[in-house]
Amino acid sequence: MRKLIFFFFICLFFLFSQCQIQKPVEIEPEKPKISQEHLLRINDLIRQSMENKDIPGAAVMIGQKNQVLFSEVYGNSQLVPDPSPMEYDMIFDLASLTKPVATATSIMILVERGQIHLREKVKDYIPGFKPFLNEQGNYGDDARIWHLLTHTSGLPPYIKNENIPHHFGSFVTLNNMVAYIANMDKTNPPGEDFHYSCLGFICLSYIIKQITGQSVDEFSQENIFIPLGMNHTFFNPPEELKKKCVPTEVIEDLCLKGLVHDPLARVLGGISGNAGLFSTASNLSIFAQMLLNKGEFNGVRILSPLSVERMTEIYRSVFFSGRGLGWDLESPYSSSGGDLFGARSFGHTGYTGTSLWIDPETQIYVILLTNRVHPDDRGSVVSLRSKIANIAASSLLKKQ
């Protein structure tokens, strides 16, 4: 009996000692499996676009969350008056990427601070903002702030270039332009149709100034770009950096270099809610990482996680539009998302040939910066955007 008891305790001691000695197995997080060889297919695409004279050159950056996977520049930054090679730190006219990056983000910061809410009427900030007038001569509902952000306010897309001097004269201010926009006939009742409108984002920049006393330039610098360390992102690039700016169109013998391409932003002195922002591929990658990190980058929080979610999902009241709050998800303008990224992916394009697309599911972002309008506004990047997005998406060998 004693032998059995002794044997029993020996077994217990052995088991206990083994438990003490055995350490838990440390499992390293699996690194993303990316086919770098597959990403190199982008080189052939860009070269073909340059041979077709669709673009003079390009900068491409692809990343996954906090890691840059691919970064390359191609061709020339300009062709006239003299060819000049593209460089990694070149500054591009982002055109309509201004809308989500500067304007919509600024509005959402104000929402978080309780200084505005999205269902407020536009006319509360822009007196005289005329509602839709139907065939019976009756005015409809008032447009709300969210209608401006989703391009469903009923505002027309633009003001024809040839009408700008006629409507505003030689001296244009944001105040008199917004007064003119407010009085324009609306194309539809708010929330009933989607018409991509630069005018709505000009109104949003006016609203930012009404609330804060700052232009969209001043507010976005102070609350977005400086905190993030995006030190080559700005409206109206400083004189000492204009040599790094990629030129756009040549208009009346003037090559627009460091001067915004968009006509309405240009007559507003380069500062507008619809266009005017300049940046680099590396600076835009910081912004993309901030969104993928749910509003935070390097310990600096710009937006709350819920704000990022609301901005980057199709807005519930106008699901037909395929638009979020400033961002594009599934609209006629979303070609830069390609065919493979999921339904939660979002982004935006710019008329000058720029685009940013982000996929929260795979944590991949795709930045394509070109100056396809240089020198004569004949280039095209619609197909190129989609193909690069498809290569980026299919380079991921293991879904995260």
Across the structure, where does each feature detected by a protein language model lie?
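Short, surface-exposed beta-strand/loop micro-motifs that present aromatic residues
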Residues: S345, T352-Y365
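Bacterial N-terminal signal peptides
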Residues: F7-L15
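Positively charged n-region of N-terminal signal peptides that target proteins for export
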Residues: M1-L4
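Active-site SXXK
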Residues: I46, V60, N66, D93-R119, ...
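Bacterial Sec-dependent signal peptides at the C-terminal "C-region" and cleavage site
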Residues: L15-E28
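Short, glycine/proline-biased beta-turn/loop segments that scaffold the active-site neighborhood
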Residues: L118-N134, I226-L228
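Short, conserved catalytic-motif segment at the N-terminal edge
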Residues: K31-F92, Q115, P131-F132, A182-N183, ...
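Short, surface-exposed loop or secondary-structure junction motifs
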Residues: Q78, L133-R344
